[in-house]
């Protein structure tokens, strides 16, 4: 399932469920056709975690190489990402832009193949696959169209042969320490809030004990070092140019936030970061001068989400961290979208979208359309949104300042 095609219609109800379908399908194939080792090639939101879950379940020699991110687009002289197409719809309904600009976004926001261009869910998970140690360096960030991506694929194919010879299996790498390294990286790069759901599911398949408390504690202890699109105008290609995930982990190691003794598909994590550039200070900040002292995600709980919720705090404006507003409640995504586009929502409102959870949706669909509409209407610094559904990694109402809270339990 491509989440970009499943947005704002009944197809999004199938998206999260497809993760389990992917995992189960791989189990069927690997059980029916016994293989000595597996090369996984994921590149969209649910495919990445679904494949990692399958790797843990089957526990064979395994290695990942993603298809790679796309390059950012360019519209009206500005670099843009996929999310801005949806924001343009809000601008169009507001009369801010006309047909010609909307068509420009449609034609040019996604100029190449690849898993979008920002720190959305697919790229977040590809980066965390690298942080866990299941892929070679740069697998999470090397652009899909670069020649280096082809060389990376060849290197991955050579490496799986060695993993088979050494009988290094998936669960030798998907350990508690590796998963905690991934959580630290998650917080440092300001990744998608969907990573909370996926890392918990991966840990469950691998028999690793990780809880929401572990995630929240890791966030409180880990500084955010990078802030990428949709929360800024920095893209995955920019992160790749300054060293990628290995440089992020290298900086985290200097601050004592990761364990570099852990095993990966290519030596220890210490071996991998030894060759990585140091943090450049602009795209990858240092631990001494972080974007924020705690992580990009936070776990919240209260009377609306007794079992927990997640907020992408690293993309919230300081003035929106304490927000009181008028609740306007909608029974479903479409009703909320209609209200936003028809100017029912005004500054100071809290949009509450309910009955979009795992059972209510069903399928816990993403709320990209309403969040993008909020941005397009210019309300992202004055309106909050709470839902029992999920938020797309491409949502940047939080990036513009609005508060987005999605339930995870």
Annotate each predicted stretch with a short phrase.
Residues 1-66, 356:
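Long, structured ligand/cofactor-binding scaffold of large enzymes
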Residues 10-11, 15, 48, 54-59, ...:
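Catalytic or ion-coupling anion/metal-binding cores of large enzyme and transporter domains
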């Amino acid at each position: 399932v491509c989440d970009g095609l499943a947005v704002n219609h009944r197809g999004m109800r199938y998206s999260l469920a497809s993760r389990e379908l992917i995992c189960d399908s791989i189990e069927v194939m690997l059980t029916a056709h016994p293989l000595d080792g597996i090369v996984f090639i994921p590149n969209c939101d649910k495919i990445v975690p679904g494949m990692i879950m399958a790797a843990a379940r089957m526990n064979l020699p395994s290695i990942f190489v993603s298809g790679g991110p796309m390059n950012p687009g360019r519209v009206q002289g500005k670099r843009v990402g996929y999310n801005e197409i949806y924001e343009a719809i809000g601008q169009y309904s507001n009369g801010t832009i006309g047909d010609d600009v909307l068509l420009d976004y449609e034609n040019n926001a996604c100029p190449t193949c690849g898993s979008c261009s920002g720190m959305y869910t697919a790229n977040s998970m590809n980066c965390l696959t690298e942080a866990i140690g299941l892929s070679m360096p740069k697998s999470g960030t090397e652009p899909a169209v670069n020649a280096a991506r082809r060389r990376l694929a060849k290197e991955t194919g050579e490496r799986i042969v060695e993993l088979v010879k050494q009988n290094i299996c998936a669960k030798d790498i998907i350990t508690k320490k590796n998963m905690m390294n991934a959580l630290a990286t998650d917080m440092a790069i300001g990744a998608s809030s969907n990573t909370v759901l996926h890392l918990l599911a991966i840990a469950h398949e691998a028999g690793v004990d990780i809880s929401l408390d572990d995630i929240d504690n890791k966030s409180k202890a880990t500084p955010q070092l990078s802030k990428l699109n949709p929360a800024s105008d920095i893209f995955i290609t920019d992160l790749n140019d300054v060293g990628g995930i290995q440089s992020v982990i290298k900086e985290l190691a200097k601050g004592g936030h990761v364990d570099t003794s852990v095993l990966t598909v290519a030596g220890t994590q210490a071996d991998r970061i030894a060759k990585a550039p140091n943090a450049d200070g602009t795209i990858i900040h240092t631990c001494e001068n972080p974007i924020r002292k705690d992580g990009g995600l936070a776990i919240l709980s209260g009377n609306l989400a007794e079992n927990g919720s997640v907020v992408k705090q690293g993309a919230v404006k300081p003035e929106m961290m304490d927000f009181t507003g008028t609740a306007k409640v909608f029974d479903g995504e479409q009703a909320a979208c209609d209200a936003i586009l028809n100017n029912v929502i005004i500054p100071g409102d809290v949009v509450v979208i309910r009955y979009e959870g795992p059972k209510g949706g069903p399928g816990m669909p993403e709320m990209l359309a309403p969040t993008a509409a909020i941005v397009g209407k210019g309300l992202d610094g004055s309106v909050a949104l709470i839902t029992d559904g999920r938020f797309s990694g491409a949502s940047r109402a939080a990036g513009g300042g609005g508060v987005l809270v999605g339930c995870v339990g």
